[in-house]
Every structure is written in structure tokens, then in C-alpha cells.
Amino acid sequence: MSKDEYLITDAPLKALTVFAMPMILGSFFQQVYNMADSIIVGQFVGSSALAAVGACAALTNVFICVALGAGVGAGVLVSRYFGAKEYGKMKTIVSTSLISFLLLSILLGIFGFCFSHAMMSGLQTPADILEEAVLYLRVYFVGFPFLFMYNILSTMFTSIGESKIPLVLLIFSSILNIVMDLWMVAGLGLGVFGAAFATLIAQGISAVFSLLIFFNRMRRYQSPFQRFDGRGLRSMLRIAVPSVLQQSTVSIGMMIVQAVVNPFGTQALAGYAATMRVENVFSLIFVSIGNAVSPYVSQNLGAGKTERIKKGYHAALVLDVCFAALAFLVIETLHTQISSLFLGKDGTALAYQVSEDYMRSLGYFFIFMGIKMATDGVLRGLGIMQPFLIANMVNLAIRLSVALICAPRFGIDFVWLAVPAGWLANFLVSYAALRKSWPGEKVESSRIFS
């Protein structure tokens, strides 16, 4: 038995823990990578520059979610064929996805660059930080194809049970990003532009290394394959499109929240931007667990070991409870210190109040996000996409309703309630669908993916 096949052989909790931990650590370094801009800009330039960088975060996350969702669409099929040892079909999906998504990333980068000003204006970005926010965003979109392809390749690695290589590459690129940030922002005084350009360089190097290592790994599987397969692309898109929408509900929700927060002023936005970075750190832990569940489910489905799927789901819930408790303890103990890390001495009392209120609210309710992501991960791994999509649209609708209706009338505190309310509603719908969809021990994987 190959060591790459531990997701279909080891005890479910052990297999998921071994598989998910590098992904969780990778998520941490991904956020270190992202937070470096905010921390260094906030400390060396000021809270207005921090607000400019933070104002871009919700929008850039939407584009990142397109990359993540596209990767999931390919990854579910790669996992299925890997579990079934159909390596020729696996490599066909890999080649088709890389060609298709490289073109998509270039088109999205051009679109984002051209419409940066319009998008930031549409989010009601305060006038005093608008131009810096647009500058940061345009540099970001120049490097977007690198970021997109890195995320696709990272998903490919995890689909074949390899989660350590993306972690090593993320650690390397995170360190490089911090060094470049310090040099360009603190050393050269390039401000917001320097922070964005440092990130672009780190993303580019990481993407190139990922591509070279992945191609080398594929040489292990000597099977003939097609460079491009239209049917394979359609199969990917049937999973990828709902996955993009699911991944995007988190970021679109953040954009909605930001649009509601923006009229409260620059200092309220600075406080929100500080906590949004913290939210991203913990959110990506639960996203990583959900993303680990999908290839686990898909590989076991492909291998015909459907009895392991429910056990894997329960193992994921155990991991979610543990990390939700950790998030609560960290936030309750260190919320003031965490806020000061971003806001520094330049932050006003309002900025600190907004940051700490939002952060503590999240700490109480992260468990809802955890169980939602695990349940969604199982549905995605089974290829059951319609209820998966409906559940995430319910999530977005709840966020819209609570944030847009309650916050302007009752105050900014109601913004924070919109997020966990959406998570809980999403879980309830997803779980109801999952209870009706557990595959029997003799279910064939082709029935699920057709």
C-alpha cells in the first residue's frame, strides 16, 4: 500500500489530523503572509494606510475564493481518480485544469486592474483613503495569476494526500514577504505600494516553485493522458461553480459588512480591518478542515470504502470543537493586545472599541463556522452540489438581512451578529441535506459524480 493512500487506510481521526494539520499551519502562514502588509503598514505608515490596505481585503478575498473554488472543482475529481488508481484520468484532469484556470486568472487580473477604482468606490470606501486603496489593489491584480495558480496547485497536492509541500512553500513565501515588506515599507518608505509589491514578488516565486515540484510529483504516475478534455472541464465546472459561490459567501459577507461599516468613518473601518485579519486566521483553520474532508470523502468514495465517510465527518467535528475552544480562549485573553498589534499608538478609542467588540463576538460563535465547513466538505466530496449551493446562499441572505436592515437602525454592534447567524443557518440546511445523502456501502462513485 502506497504511503500516499493513508486517507483510505488509516483510522479516520488520525488520517484527517495528519492530513489537515499541515493545511491548518499553511492557513496560518497564509494569514501571516497577508497580515504582514497590515501590521507593517499600520506600524510604519499609520492607521489611515492600514485602513486603505484593510479596505481591499474583503474584495481581494472574493477573487481568492474564485481560485479556491476552482481548485476544489478539480481537486474532488483528482481525489476520486487517485483513490480509484485511475492515474491517466487523474493526469488529464490536472492538465485540463491548469490550462483552463491559467487563462481564467489572466482575464480576472485584467478585469480587476481595470475596475479597481469602480469597485472600491462601490464599497463606499472613505474618500481620504480611496486612492491608496486603489493603488494597493491594482498592484495586487498584476500578480493575481501567480496567486491563482499557487492555490490551484496547492489543492492538487492535497487531493493526492500531500499537504506538507504547500506548507513548506507557504513558510518560505511568508518569510520572504515579511522581509520584502520591511525593506520596501520601513526601509525605502514606499508605503502602501511597497507592501503590495512585496506581496507580488513572494506570490510569484511561490507559484513557480509549486509548479516545478508538482510536475516532478506527477512523474510517479506513468499513465497516458490527454492534454485537454472538454468533458473533464465540464465535470470540474459542475463542482467548481458551486464551490466558488460557497467560498465567496464568506468574502461577499465580509464585503457586505464592510459596506455597512464604511459610513461609520475611517477609524471604525481601521478597527474592523484589524479584526478582519484575526477573523481570517481562525476562519481559515475551519476552512482547512472542511477542505481536508473533501478529498478524504472523495478518495474513500473512489476506493469503494463508503463506510469510512461518516466516521471521517465525526472526526472533522472533533477537530472543529477543539479549534473553536482554542479561538475562544485566545480572543478572550488577548483581544486588547491583538488589536494593538494592528492599530498601534495611532489608533483611536473608537478603532479599539470596534476591533475588540467584533473580535469577542467572533470568539463566541466560531463553532458555528466549524461545523458548517465540515458538513459542506462532506457534501462537496460526495459531489452533492445543489443543496450545498442552496445552504450557502441562505448563509449570504441571512448576512444581508441582518447587516443591512439592523445595523443602520440599531447600531454597528448588529453588524457582528450577521456573521454567526449566517453560519448557523448554513449548517442547518447542509446537515438536513447530508442526513438524506449518506452513501450506502455498495454505492458506486460514478452515481455521485455523474
Regions found by a protein language model. Give the residues of each.
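Transmembrane helical elements of multi-pass membrane transporters/channels
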Residues: 18-37, 139, 173, 202-206, ...
